C-alpha cells in the first residue's frame, strides 16, 4: 500500500547506510510494529544491499525481517514497488543529480513520500495509500505522521521535480 523504499533519506548508497536506514525505520515504528509490518524486504542485488545479516538482524542479533533478492531484470518479482519507482521518477527523473533537484534531506524525502502517497489510486478505488493506511492500520499511520509524513490535499499534490525546490 504505502511504500517505504525511499522513505529513509541516505547521504550515500552503501551497505552501512542501508542498515542504518532499516535501524531508523525500526526506531520510528517501534519493535512490535516493525516486526508486524516489515516481515520482508525485497530488493535487487546492488552492493548497498550486500549486508543481508545487518538488514535482517537488529542490534542485539535478533531476527527482525527477511531479505529476498530479486532476479536481475525481473521487475515482476517486486510487485507494486516498480509502480512506486515510476512515481518517484516523475519527481526525480533518472540520471538527474538529486542534490541539484533539491533532494538533500529527510524532510525532502518525507515531502516526496507525502505527495506520492496522498494521490488517489485506481486500484484502491479512488483512495490514497495514506487514506487506506489510516483506515487499515491507524498505529502505523500515526507513526508515519509523527515522523513527518502528511496527507496532501488532492489539488495540492505535485509530482514534478520542482516539488523539491519549494520551501515545504
Name these PLM-found stretches.
Residues 3, 22, 41-44, 78, ...:
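Mobile genetic element proteins and their domesticated derivatives, centered on retroelements
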Residues 53-55:
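Short amphipathic alpha-helical segments
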Amino acid at each position: 500500500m504505502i511504500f517505504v523504499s525511499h522513505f529513509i533519506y541516505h547521504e550515500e548508497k552503501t551497505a552501512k547506510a542501508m542498515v542504518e536506514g532499516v535501524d531508523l525505520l525500526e526506531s520510528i515504528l517501534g519493535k512490535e510494529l516493525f516486526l508486524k509490518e516489515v516481515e520482508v524486504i525485497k530488493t535487487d542485488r546492488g552492493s548497498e544491499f550486500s549486508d543481508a545479516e545487518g538488514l535482517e538482524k537488529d542490534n542485539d542479533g535478533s531476527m527482525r525481517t527477511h531479505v529476498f533478492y530479486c532476479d536481475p531484470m525481473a521487475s515482476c518479482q517486486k510487485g507494486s514497488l516498480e509502480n512506486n519507482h515510476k512515481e518517484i521518477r516523475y519527481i526525480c527523473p533518472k540520471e538527474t543529480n538529486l542534490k541539484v533537484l533539491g533532494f538533500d534531506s529527510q524532510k525532502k524525502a518525507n515531502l516526496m513520500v507525502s505527495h506520492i502517497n496522498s494521490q488517489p489510486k485506481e486500484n484502491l478505488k479512488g483512495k490514497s495509500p495514506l487514506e487506506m493506511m489510516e483506515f487499515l492500520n491507524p498505529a502505523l499511520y500515526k507513526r508515519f505522521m509523527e515522523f513527518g509524513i502528511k496527507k496532501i490535499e488532492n489539488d495540492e499534490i505535485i509530482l514534478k521535480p520542482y516539488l523539491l525546490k519549494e520551501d515545504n
